[in-house]
């Protein structure tokens, strides 16, 4: 994920741990900033990454070839190595936006997440359940996690959604 999320520092911590025993296994590890969960599992499937961090629901969809991974089909070679932390779906709204519930997002300026991110994937699932499309928002922005907090503070969006472990840097902003 992005540098202000939890995946990037988690990847860095894993790489530091791997570096301590590199003489034993010879594996080099580098943390990269990426588009997020969907991007990561697709990059692992394509052989562009050997290891990636992803939301468990995204892993499930990729493994079974359902929802956003239906067109690609199941990926039976995908493996879950370990779980890091829970990632609640979080909605942050401007106090003056009149948003008190998820339903209140309709008709507002909402950052739905960048394509390839777990937050976008989760938001699309929720939108489908609500019977919404992108057209139901006054603005459906596709900012990356690192950009959405500033957009909220600058009054460019009314709300942002984020599937992230807490504490998260961009929400602290």
Short names for language-model regions:
Residues 1-61, 70-71:
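N-terminal (or domain-start) structured segment
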Residues 56-58, 67, 97, 134-173:
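Pocket-lining segment of extracytoplasmic ligand-binding domains
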Residues 1-21, 83, 87-154:
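Bilobed "Venus flytrap"/periplasmic-binding protein-like clamshell domains
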Residues 26-28, 75-78, 107, 136-137:
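A generic structural signal for alpha->beta connector loops
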Residues 70-84, 89:
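A structural signal for short loop-to-beta-strand junctions that line the ligand-binding cleft
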Residues 25, 45-54, 109-110, 153-162:
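Alpha-to-beta junction loops
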Residues 49, 56-59, 86, 94-97, ...:
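Solvent-exposed coil/turn segments that connect beta secondary-structure elements
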Residues 8-10, 41, 63-65, 122-124, ...:
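Short, solvent-exposed loop/turn and secondary-structure capping segments
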